């Protein structure tokens, strides 16, 4: 090897190795101080890219887990509000059951409806004011997407539904609304109610006054209706008619009449004080003149005593064919009922509803006048109309009864099948609560899965970018030794050119 001064190859070689060990020492110290194997892309370009993607996923999934917890909070907030709505609905149902009981007075129903209205208003208030972080969760139908992944499209949707009185089908819910008026309601709820029921018997039309029961013809100028005393037929003639049969007269009868012979025979066969019946009336033998049949008998008709005298029977006669009969009063037999009477004619009586029914009259509509207005009622009396519109009985704020038509009653009408309506509302609330409960469980599962994934990704990233302290400490020790050795050797290498000086001596 040539002996030169200008170039110290050994020194250069030693410096180069010293630089290498310096670089190794710097790298080891950097890794040990940061805890990372990859501190820059030059440490491991591919590993750095992989670890960076892991970091993105880990950070995204960690935030997704927080998002899922927010989703649980939203569901819990909504479900809590629905629970209170459910409580109000249960109370409304309880009150509705109470209202359907027939023992309630008008004031009872008003009190019940007042509380129901307050409960329904509270449901609307809860719906409008319940919110999570400024988002109203029950005031409208909405789909809220919760990001539960580190990438696009990785979401879980919470279906939020509008839950208020209207959406529950309880808008206008009422247990104390106007009820369809009946004729009975008009009579009991209003004063000075007048009117009549109509009846038809064949071609004949009649009216029956709803208050007095008087029967008249159904005409613009109605006539009073009577019952014919003889045949029971309806008539507008009130004159006396149906002449009665003059059975016992104050003038002596001709000999041998049926009545004279019958009574003479009773006297002949009896004794004074005996009684006997004739034509359904009891007679008493007052006197008996011998045993031929002559004598007197008496009876009481309509509270008055009547004496009949039998005479002109020849003493010792074998029969009573010569008997004559004379009465202290004229006595007649009614052709209507066959009873004894002092009247020679029977007067027609005013017709009654029972007389119409006896003549097979069929009830028609009724005309009822209330506060000057005339209403029409059907034959059953359970539907009252005015100008073709069904009428309802309502109450003013002061509790006074009033009549309103079907148009005015529509907005205030009692809810048909109120319990079924509330049960339907409860079912809807239950369905929404069930959905929210299920979504909470789903979020719990998603959070658990996200935690597992983050743990595994952290482990994977650690294996790529975290420093192995055993290895790095070993590398640092090696580099330190090489540094010390290199420094010592470099000092000796720098002295080598001085050997040339010995050649100059």
Swiss-Prot record:
Q: Does the keyword Lyase apply?
A: no
Keywords (alphabetical) are: Bacterial flagellum, Secreted
Q: Which Pfam families match?
A: Flagellin_C, Flagellin_N, FliC-like_3rd
GO MF, one term, reads:
structural molecule activity
- Note the Gene3D superfamilies from the entry: 6.10.280.190, f41 fragment of flagellin, C-terminal domain, f41 fragment of flagellin, middle domain, f41 fragment of flagellin, N-terminal domain, Flagellar export chaperone, C-terminal domain
For this chain, the family text in UniProt reads: Belongs to the bacterial flagellin family.
Q: What is this protein called?
A: Flagellin
Name the gene that codes for it.
Answer: fliC
């Amino acid at each position: 090897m040539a002996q030169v001064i200008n170039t110290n190859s050994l020194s250069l070689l030693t410096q180069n190795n010293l630089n290498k060990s310096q670089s190794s020492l710097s790298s080891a110290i950097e890794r040990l101080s940061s805890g990372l194997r990859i501190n820059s892309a030059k440490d491991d370009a591919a590993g750095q890219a992989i670890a960076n993607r892991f970091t993105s996923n880990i950070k995204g999934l960690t935030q997704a887990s927080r998002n899922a917890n927010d989703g649980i909070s939203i569901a819990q907030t909504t479900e809590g509000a629905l629970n209170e709505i459910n409580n109000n609905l249960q109370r409304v149902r309880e009150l509705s059951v109470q209202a359907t009981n027939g023992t309630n007075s008008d004031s009872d129903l008003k009190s019940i409806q007042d509380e129901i209205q307050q409960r329904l208003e509270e449901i609307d208030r809860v719906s409008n004011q319940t919110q999570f972080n400024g988002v109203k969760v029950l005031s409208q139908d909405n789909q809220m997407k919760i990001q539960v992944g580190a990438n696009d499209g990785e979401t879980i949707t919470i279906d939020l539904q509008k839950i208020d009185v209207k959406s529950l089908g309880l808008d206008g819910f009422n247990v104390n609304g106007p009820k369809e008026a009946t004729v009975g309601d008009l009579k009991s709820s209003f004063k000075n109610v007048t009117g009549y029921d109509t009846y038809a018997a064949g071609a004949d039309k009649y009216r029956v006054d709803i208050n007095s029961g008087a029967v008249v013809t159904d005409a613009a100028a109605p006539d009073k209706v009577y019952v014919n005393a003889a045949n029971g037929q309806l008539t507008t003639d009130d004159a006396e008619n149906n002449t009665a049969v003059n059975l016992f007269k104050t003038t002596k009868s001709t000999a041998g009449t049926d009545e004279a012979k019958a009574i003479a025979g009773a006297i002949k066969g009896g004794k004074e004080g005996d009684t006997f019946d004739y034509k359904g009336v009891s007679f008493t033998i007052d006197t008996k003149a011998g045993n031929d049949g002559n004598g007197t008998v008496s009876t009481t008709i309509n509270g008055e005593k009547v004496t009949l005298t039998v005479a002109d029977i020849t003493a010792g006669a074998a029969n009573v064919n010569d008997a004559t009969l004379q009465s202290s009063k004229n006595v007649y037999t009614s052709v209507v009922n066959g009873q004894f009477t002092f009247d020679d004619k029977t007067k027609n009586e005013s017709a009654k509803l029972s007389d119409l029914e006896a003549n097979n009259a069929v009830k028609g509509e009724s005309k009822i006048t209330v506060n000057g207005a005339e209403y029409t009622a059907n034959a059953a009396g359970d539907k009252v109309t005015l100008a073709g519109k069904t009428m309802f009985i309502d109450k003013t704020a002061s509790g006074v009864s009033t009549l309103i038509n079907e148009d005015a009653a529509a907005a205030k009408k009692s809810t048909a099948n109120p319990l079924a309506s509330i049960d339907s509302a409860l079912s809807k609330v239950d369905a929404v609560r069930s959905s929210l409960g299920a979504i909470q469980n789903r979020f719990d599962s998603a959070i658990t899965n996200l935690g597992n994934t983050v743990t595994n990704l952290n482990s994977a990233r650690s294996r790529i970018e975290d420093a192995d302290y055993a290895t790095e400490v070993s590398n640092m020790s090696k580099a330190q030794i090489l540094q010390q050795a290199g420094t010592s050797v470099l000092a000796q290498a720098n002295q080598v050119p001085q050997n040339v000086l010995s050649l100059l001596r």
